[in-house]
Amino acid sequence: MKNITYIISIILLGFVSVSCQKDLDQNPIDPDSFTQQDVFANAQQAKGALAKVYASLALTGQQGPAGQPDISDIDEGFSQFSRMLFNLNELTTDHAVIAWGDPGLQDLHGMYWTAGNDFTDAMYYRLAQTVSFANSFIENAEDLNSDQEVKYFIAEARFIRAYAYYNLMDLYANVPLVTKISTELPTQSNRQEIFDFVESELLDIQDKLKDSGTNEYGRVDKVAAWALLSRLYLNAETWIGTPRYNDCVHFSELAMNSSYHINTNDANGNGSAYDELFLADNNMNGAQNEFIFELNFDGQHSQTYGGTTFLIHAAVGGSMQPGDYGINGGWFGSRTTKNLVNKFGNADISALNNSIGGTVSNWGLVGDATPNGWSGPDVQMYETATNEYALYIELTSGSIKFRYDNNWGQNYGDTGADGTLDNGGDNIAIANPGIYFVTMDLNNMTYTIAPYKSDARAMFYTDGQSLEITDVSQFNEGYAVTKFKNIDVNGNQGSDSSGSFADTDLPLIRLAEVYLNYAEATLRGGNGSISTAVDKINELRTRAYGSNSGNITASDLNLDFVLDERSRELYWEGLRRTDLIRYGYFTSGSYLWPFKGNEANGTGVDSYRKIFPLPNNVIAINPNLQQNPGY
């Protein structure tokens, strides 16, 4: 599929069955027996054709994970949309490195790709094919347009086409705009023209899509149009030179006020509801209520070497146990750089203690587990109510006691190790180093010592992995990312008993992103509310920390904070390159990461790398097209 004008009809390609319990409810169509009239004879048959439009973003061909690929000249597994989105939007940034030596792959993180790169070409072909499928569906389904359900189908196909063009505009900028089946060579459109098309399509279909939450899981409703408009307008100033932050705020608000909501269901009981978003049962564990547009995967019925199968397998290696992630083996590929790890940083103990309230008291902690040791002085606690005290403190392995005014005349330990204070009692053991929240209640003569819950979004495997990277081809250099897993909330492996293919669905747009769009647009001059922005970000951080201990105030909210929060919340979800470009950090020397510009410590690169080259084959076929600058 080497030409956007080489229109492949859905009728000629046939259909793959992507029907499964968590996918579009459709009857599979035998690709060897149907005719065009059969496929579009009624709404139910048309729904099968619509499934192919959706599946063009999830699957790679007509014969399971390999055998009859939609796109040639690249390994079929590499050709899946979200796998290529990872390669172009995450691997090119501080979020990811990969160990493999496939030709052209290391060029992406090193930022020295050229025209003809297999991966930049294949993404163009994949998106062009999605446009082709959508165009074919829209034209052929028009004959059934009197059926209300088919009207919804057409609006959904238009959304998928707009989403494909959104990505073509982001990645390649200047592409042909093709909306009808045609054999004529199209002219080249610029970014403004593509932007205008995507905007007009989304605005037109917002009231033609189903209402919020009324469509079946796996199909979009009008909130998807609002959320994509939110993303579009956030990038408008970067792409077309015109700020559209008020519009970003408006459509973000529509999405935020819809039936979708942030998942707060900690179904596996580990203290945070964040990880549920990326488990094998994320279509039913509560995460689905946050997913506005997602790719559905099923380890038995919609197999691919892309999607979450890639994200999970490629990130497992070294001393990691594949079974812990619901798979049969790791591919020893993807890791992250210290830049992402350091976004989570160390807890600000001073800020945590300021959040306690109350006043500094004469009671404190002493012991070899404290920073000052047994010789003191005591680390003073805060009196939060009469005879009630609290403190965040970093402790080492050892022992502590409570002491008054640096004087052993009044001290408390715990002789029975039962949480009860005893005057002059035994030392209180601290088994593991870390940050703790310590309380003392002299009204009831009790105390608590609880580990501080850090940001649960920091999902890294560090055993045998170095933080520093000197050779990207070595899997043990760089922390492994454990964000995606093929296990459910009960720890059970996905439906593929072999452990080869994942059930985990992949969110392409979720409500958390819209929250962050709103905050950034407000800070950039949009007519949103700073108070609302803080509240929405604190929703995300409360989920991440399992409490309000990580919450921020308006004084903490600035553009760089939002960028870092986007990194913490959305890493490996296909947005990082676009974010860095919007902030002016992608190609510049002002923000570096390991092997940016193919140098160990990173270096700036030419600004033309903000967009990728058009495929040489496309330009050779179509004399109307010019290569992007720099290539």
For each of these PLM feature ranges, what is it?
Residues 21-156, 160-171, 176-193, 261-357, ...:
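Short acidic-aromatic linear motifs embedded in glycine-rich loops, typified by GG[WY][YF]DAGD(H)
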Residues 356-451:
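Insoluble glucan recognition modules
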Residues 169-170, 176, 235-241, 524-527:
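Short coil/turn linking the two alpha-helices of tandem helical-hairpin repeats
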Residues 181-238, 243-266:
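Hydrophobic, small-residue-rich alpha-helical packing segments that form membrane-like cores
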Residues 14-41, 198, 230, 519, ...:
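Bacterial Sec-dependent N-terminal signal peptides
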